[in-house]
């Protein structure tokens, strides 16, 4: 009986086996080739496998390299922030899951803080969502609000994940550039880079679902003026368009400039998601905590994405962040408040970088906010003929050469551009200056020695 059943099973399986073998022979496919077709990537990530941060962080990982590339502070976070985390780690129930949309004490602190700027009550449970960094906020917003076939306006240069996330949602990024209009007799500043109102208006149509705004801007350091934001707001209202406002550098604004929140403009609260970051606020990028603020009718869709992906964020980190916020909320007019002390500290570092670059004949774009500075390296005489991949933009090859030969890391600015505009920015590199004085000293030594060699 058993043998008969075994033969029957063998016979019943054989046609399927023969069919598979026959197909393989006819198509000339090996088993590995068949598997590669079977397990090919999903279309939504087609062409998105290359990543500037993965590639250049790896190159700069050598301890001998002075890393002014990735926006990675090597200054110490505030002492009280670290102390709060240390205390909280010892509390048993704060090492377990918390509320999926944001730890209660943290959303309450965020509500209290931002009500001072929005001039209206913010419901901590319905109008704030705590996420895995600002990346998480962007992902939730785009996945929760953008549909296949929609168009999303992206301002060039842009933080690289904007384009990738829009494409993963099946939408089409529509690019509009910031254009430089320098003022005679004045150092080139990030404020010289502006949108052409008519060009911007031409990008809006019935398919436009959203515009992604970034102020203060990465990589330029541009802080949008009230008048510039009003132009964007008027177009959003006219075309019934959402605004995803990435404001992670909101506290890092330098003398003579002011940060405005577009969500506070008439008619914009109901159509705006505003994004913030713990990493940029308290110099704790490794904590990977961010938040989205907006009206309930928008935030609820971001909550749906979060509850079906990451579900919740780390409880101890959220509680420590909440306590850190309460400390600074109580002293916002005090120079010791980190929201006030950090930009003052960084403005000194910014000015140092500007002076250093000028001293060796390099033009820079002086940032009005953020902690990056862009330098024009076209005047440096560098032989890049030995670089392997000749198809890469000049700035990619330049930075790789600089890491290898000068032990100094930066980020190529063309990484922040769409394919059509890369050539306009390929002679620029971005340096990060939220660094210890000793790190900046080492960078200065490298740059000045390099300049002496070329003179």
UniProtKB/Swiss-Prot annotation:
Keywords: Acetylation, Aminotransferase, Lyase, Pyridoxal phosphate, Transferase. One of its GO terms (cellular component) is cytoplasm. Substrate binds at residues 71, 218, 430. InterPro entries: Aminotransferase_I/II_large, Kynurenine-oxoglutarate_AT, PyrdxlP-dep_Trfase, PyrdxlP-dep_Trfase_major, PyrdxlP-dep_Trfase_small. Pathway: Amino-acid degradation; L-kynurenine degradation; kynurenate from L-kynurenine: step 1/2. GO terms for molecular function: cysteine-S-conjugate beta-lyase activity; kynurenine-glyoxylate transaminase activity; kynurenine-oxoglutarate transaminase activity; pyridoxal phosphate binding. The keyword Repressor does not apply. It catalyses: L-kynurenine + 2-oxoglutarate = kynurenate + L-glutamate + H2O; L-kynurenine + glyoxylate = kynurenate + glycine + H2O; 3-hydroxy-L-kynurenine + glyoxylate = xanthurenate + glycine + H2O; an S-substituted L-cysteine + H2O = a thiol + pyruvate + NH4(+). Its cofactor is pyridoxal 5'-phosphate. Its EC number is 2.6.1.7, 4.4.1.13, 2.6.1.63. The keyword Acetylation applies. The modification N6-succinyllysine is found at residue 116. The modification N6-acetyllysine is found at residue 116. Pfam families: Aminotran_1_2. The modification N6-(pyridoxal phosphate)lysine is found at residue 280. GO terms for biological process: amino acid metabolic process; biosynthetic process; kynurenine metabolic process; L-kynurenine catabolic process. Homodimer. Catalyzes the irreversible transamination of the L-tryptophan metabolite L-kynurenine to form kynurenic acid (KA), an intermediate in the tryptophan catabolic pathway which is also a broad spectrum antagonist of the three ionotropic excitatory amino acid receptors among others. May catalyze the beta-elimination of S-conjugates and Se-conjugates of L-(seleno)cysteine, resulting in the cleavage of the C-S or C-Se bond. Belongs to the class-I pyridoxal-phosphate-dependent aminotransferase family. This is Kynurenine--oxoglutarate transaminase 3. It comes from Bos taurus (Bovine). The lineage of its organism: Eukaryota, Metazoa, Chordata, Craniata, Vertebrata. The gene is KYAT3.
């Amino acid at each position: 009986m058993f043998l008969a059943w075994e033969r029957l099973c063998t016979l019943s399986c054989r046609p399927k086996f023969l069919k598979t073998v026959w197909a393989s022979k006819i198509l000339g496919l090996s088993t590995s080739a068949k598997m590669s077709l079977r397990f090919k990537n999903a279309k939504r990530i087609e062409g998105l496998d290359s990543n500037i941060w993965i590639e250049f962080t790896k190159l700069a990982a050598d301890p001998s390299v002075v890393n002014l590339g990735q926006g990675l502070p090597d200054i110490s976070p505030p002492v009280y922030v670290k102390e709060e985390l240390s205390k909280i780690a010892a509390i048993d129930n704060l090492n377990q899951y918390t509320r999926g949309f944001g730890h209660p004490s943290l959303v309450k602190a965020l509500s209290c803080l931002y009500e001072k700027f929005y001039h209206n009550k913010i419901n901590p449970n319905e109008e704030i969502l705590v996420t895995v960094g600002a990346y998480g906020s962007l992902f939730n917003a785009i996945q929760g609000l953008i549909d296949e076939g929609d168009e999303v306006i992206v301002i060039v240069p842009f933080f690289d994940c904007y384009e990738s996330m829009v494409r993963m949602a099946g939408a089409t990024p529509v690019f509009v550039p910031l254009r430089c209009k320098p003022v005679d007799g004045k150092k080139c500043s990030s404020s010289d880079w502006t949108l052409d109102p008519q060009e911007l208006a031409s990008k809006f149509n019935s398919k436009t679902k959203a515009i992604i705004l970034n102020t203060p801007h990465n990589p330029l350091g541009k802080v949008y003026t009230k008048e510039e934001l009003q132009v964007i707001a008027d177009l959003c209202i006219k075309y019934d368009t959402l605004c995803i406002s990435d404001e992670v550098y909101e506290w890092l604004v330098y003398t003579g400039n002011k940060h405005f929140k577009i969500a506070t403009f008439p008619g914009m609260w109901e159509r705006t998601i505003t994004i913030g970051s713990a990493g940029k606020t308290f110099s704790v990028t490794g904590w990977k905590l961010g938040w989205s603020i907006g009206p309930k009718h928008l935030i609820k869709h971001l909550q749906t994405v979060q509850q079906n992906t990451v579900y919740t964020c780390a409880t101890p980190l959220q509680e420590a962040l909440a306590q850190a916020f309460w400390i600074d909320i109580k002293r916002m007019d005090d120079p010791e408040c980190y929201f006030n002390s950090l930009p003052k500290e960084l403005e000194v570092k910014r000015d140092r970088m500007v002076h250093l670059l000028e001293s060796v004949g390099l033009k820079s774009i002086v940032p009005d906010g953020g902690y990056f500075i862009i330098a024009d390296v076209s005047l440096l005489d560098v032989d890049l003929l030995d670089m392997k991949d000749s198809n890469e933009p000049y700035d990619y090859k330049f930075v790789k050469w600089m890491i290898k030969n000068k032990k100094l890391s930066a980020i190529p600015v063309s990484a922040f551009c769409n394919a059509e505009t890369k050539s306009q920015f390929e002679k620029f590199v971005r340096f990060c200056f939220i660094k210890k004085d000793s790190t900046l000293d080492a960078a200065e030594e490298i740059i000045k020695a390099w300049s002496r060699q070329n003179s």
